[in-house]
Amino acid sequence: MATVVAAAFVVGGLLVAGSTPPARRSSPVTVPIRGVRVYLDVSGRSPDHPGETHLTFDGNPRTSWWTDAYLGPDKAHFGGLYDGEGLAIHLARSARLQRLTVMSSTRGWAASTYVSTHGVAMSAPLADWGQMVSSRRNLQGSASFDLRGRSGDWVLLWLTDLGPAGLANVAELQIRASA
């Protein structure tokens, strides 16, 4: 009798094992970056180091783009000259975006993120980027931002606080999206 019960369990297990498994959620994939530009919502001002933005996606964490160094009592907030400066990240394709990872050695920095389905003029008002997606403060080096599944092919990393040193760097950017 025990042999018959054991055989029933084995046969039952084989039937379950042969059935279609439940669908798995696919892992996020890295979306290639086509280019990065410095974004300012203040016309008439020169962006900080626009020729070095390619260093944010060159695969080398020892190279980076830097803001200018700001001085004075409000140096963490761009010397009181304006509200922020950003990196407009143009992706190789539109996707449902999950996460932006920023490699940085800056201490005490803050930033917000925006996602767009179209390019925005580099001196257009910040409102042209649409609704803010996420925001983080008092970051101690590298950080990740939740892009909440928003669809787009442009991401803006909008720096709002440079930390106590009065300057910030971005060594590498990576964007992950739904497969």
What are these regions (language model features)?
Residues I33-V36, M132-V133, W158:
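Generic hydrophobic, helix-prone segments enriched in Leu/Val/Ile
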Residues G141:
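Aromatic sugar-binding surface patches on proteins
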Residues M1-A23:
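Hydrophobic single-pass membrane-targeting/anchoring helices
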Residues N60-L126, S144-A179:
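Aromatic, loop-rich ligand-recognition surfaces of beta-strand-rich domains
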Residues A17-A92:
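Disordered, acidic Ser/Thr/Pro-rich linker "stalks" and the adjacent N-terminal cap
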Residues V4, H49-E52, R107:
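Generic signature of intrinsically disordered, low-complexity, basic-rich segments
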Residues L126-N138:
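Solvent-exposed serine/threonine-rich low-complexity stretches and specific carbohydrate-binding patches
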